[in-house]
């Protein structure tokens, strides 16, 4: 470690040097904050130390699942898989042993972002692609170490968290958006081919579900593996499962139901599109010159080279615009992006430098494809991986793969801190899979978990379920024992549409749709709930996150509140316990909200 000394300074410029290392720094007021440009004389690991405010909380760093406040922790700046095998094994095969929930230091993230917001209402953002570690373990300093010197740092401050968020959005635009139809009810995952999809859609409509859309991720085919039913990674309609694709999508549209699909930047080995791309040099290579294959559970796949212009054009024009949007698809999951190997060979660029940027490149390609299509304004896609700048391109993010349980490290509760931290990083519109995704052996979702998750996501920007990796052994929203709850809660989401649209307008300014309890007051000292949230400014939600619970104890933010579905008046700032029968969300609205009349009209 070589400390750099100040060797030259002027009004807005400084130079630091020692031995052969030199960094020139210039400062400029822009975007309502301070841009600090860093120009090193080479590539070298850099450590930046900033004074900390005693007692402050630190939020952000991208999608951090285990807790909101990162003070006392380290955050790794490296895009990675969130889900790992050992916790699943402990919960299932070794379930006779007590399960100890994992700490923050154990848990990776699909979406690290080098933006950090303090409870003192300032934020630091670094423009950097390299691996790094943000160290908040010291009381007197925040220490940022990167494998290469950041290109710049950005400092934002304000008199409220919303003001800081707006300044961050001025520096990196928040271009999140959802078509209005997304808020007309619930998007329910249904797989298995058009006959089954249509049957389930008809059943749900008959049962009173406000069905905004159906999401059929196996539209391109199904691959049954050792872990469950997976998608066949060949991005064109499977004519066996989904025959007469255009006509059947139109038939759903006539019922008022949208159709959603799935894509990722990989192609199953020896599939038709894999062979097409391999022949044209569109797949990423290994150092020996062959195609670099990754293994997904039990099958191999090639990776589309997103640095190769011909491959990018093929993804946009053929896979997205022709094969999906041109055939009536209204939205889709743009999965993955976190797996670029650092030892591969790309058409252009260093994979080690592009690893963190890969999810943003993937989101950018999808956004450009959607916006260049005549139906672009009616279509959205959702991503799970991200990095700095993802908010410029992804229309909405989801929290990735959660376990189908109530554990706070990988289960339903973890999506709340994860969403808060994304919001403090600049990503303002996030949702989760209703019911979770990870299911293995005895790890399967109960009817109770599904309904509690549905209660929560009725109060979110996007209400969408997942069938899990094992649809046949997990309770689904259309199952007879829960469909009445699905119907009631989908109606709640649809009734909130005018308010949710307002929340999405604010998200375009950088203000998160879902916020922690202290966001509006700005007083972090009054923070009591990592597992409750403000939806916009005027709604407070306290999901039930414990199996078997029939009540929820929570402290509401200061002010006068009214409980949804009962009209009980509640004074904020004090801890209280509320009954929570299954299917009845613990949710409140401000008594003086301009939307109070709307909220009072919402019924289960």
Residue ranges of model-derived segments:
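Catalytic core of carbohydrate-active enzymes
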Residues: 368-378, 386-399, 422-432, 437-604
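Alpha-amylase-like alpha-glycosidases and glucanotransferases acting on alpha-linked glucans and related
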Residues: 286-329, 363-404, 465-485
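Catalytic nucleotidyl-transfer cores of nucleotide-processing enzymes
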Residues: 252, 397-413, 500
């Amino acid at each position: 470690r070589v400390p750099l000394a100040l060797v030259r300074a002027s009004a807005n410029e400084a130079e630091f040097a020692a031995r052969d290392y030199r960094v020139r720094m210039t400062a400029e007021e822009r975007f309502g904050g301070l841009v600090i440009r860093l120009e090193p004389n080479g590539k070298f690991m850099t450590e930046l130390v900033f004074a900390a405010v005693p007692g402050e909380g630190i939020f952000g760093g991208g999608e951090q699942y285990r807790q909101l406040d990162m003070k006392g922790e380290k955050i790794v700046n490296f895009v990675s898989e969130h889900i790992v095998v050992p916790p699943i094994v402990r919960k299932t095969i070794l379930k006779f042993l007590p399960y100890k929930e994992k700490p923050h230091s154990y848990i990776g993230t699909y979406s690290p972002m080098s933006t950090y917001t303090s409870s003192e209402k300032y934020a630091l953002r670094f423009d950097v692609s390299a691996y790094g570690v943000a160290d908040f373990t010291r009381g007197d300093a925040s220490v940022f170490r990167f494998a290469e010197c950041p290109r710049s740092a950005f400092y934002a401050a304000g008199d409220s968290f919303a003001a800081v968020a707006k300044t961050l959005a001025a520096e990196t635009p928040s271009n999140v958006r959802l078509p209005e139809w997304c808020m007309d009810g619930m998007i329910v995952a249904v797989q298995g081919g058009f006959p089954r999809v249509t049957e389930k859609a008809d059943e749900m409509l008959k049962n009173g579900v406000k069905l905004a859309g159906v999401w059929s991720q196996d539209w391109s085919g199904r691959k049954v593996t050792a872990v469950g039913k997976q998608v066949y990674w060949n991005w064109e309609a499977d004519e066996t499962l989904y025959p007469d694709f255009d006509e059947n999508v139109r038939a759903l549209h006539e019922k008022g139901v949208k159709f959603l699909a799935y894509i990722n930047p990989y192609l199953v080995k020896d599939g038709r599109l894999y062979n097409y791309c391999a022949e044209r040099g569109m797949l990423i290579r290994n150092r020996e010159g062959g195609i670099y294959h990754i293994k997904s559970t039990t099958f191999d796949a090639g990776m589309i080279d997103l640095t190769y212009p011909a491959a990018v054009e093929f993804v946009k024009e053929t896979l997205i615009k022709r094969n999906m949007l041109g055939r009536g698809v209204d939205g889709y999951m743009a999965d993955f992006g976190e797996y670029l190997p650092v030892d591969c060979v790309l058409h252009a660029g260093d994979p080690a430098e592009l690893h963190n940027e890969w999810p943003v490149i993937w989101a950018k390609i999808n956004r450009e494809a959607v916006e260049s299509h005549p139906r672009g304004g009616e279509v959205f896609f959702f991503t799970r991986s991200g990095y700095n700048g993802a908010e410029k391109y992804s229309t909405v993010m989801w929290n990735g793969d959660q376990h189908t349980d109530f554990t706070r490290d990988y289960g339903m509760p973890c999506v709340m801190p994860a969403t808060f931290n994304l919001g403090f990083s600049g990503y303002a519109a996030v949702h989760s899979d209703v019911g979770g995704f990870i299911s293995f052996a005895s790890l399967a979702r109960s009817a109770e978990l599904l309904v509690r998750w549905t209660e929560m996501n009725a109060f979110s920007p996007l209400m969408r379920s997942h069938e899990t990796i094992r649809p046949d052994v997990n309770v689904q929203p259309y199952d007879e024992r829960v469909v009445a709850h699905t119907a009631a809660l989908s109606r709640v989401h649809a009734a909130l549409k005018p308010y949710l649209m307002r929340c999405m307008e604010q998200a375009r300014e950088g203000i998160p749709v879902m916020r922690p309890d202290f966001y509006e007051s700005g007083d972090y000292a009054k923070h009591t709930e990592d597992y409750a949230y403000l939806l916009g400014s005027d709604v407070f939600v306290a999901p039930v996150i414990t199996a078997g619970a029939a009540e929820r104890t929570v402290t509401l933010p200061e002010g006068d509140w009214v409980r949804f579905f009962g009209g009980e008046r509640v004074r904020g700032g004090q801890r209280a316990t509320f009954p929570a029968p299954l299917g009845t969300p613990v949710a409140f609205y401000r008594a003086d909200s301009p939307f109070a009349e709307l909220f009072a009209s919402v019924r289960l």
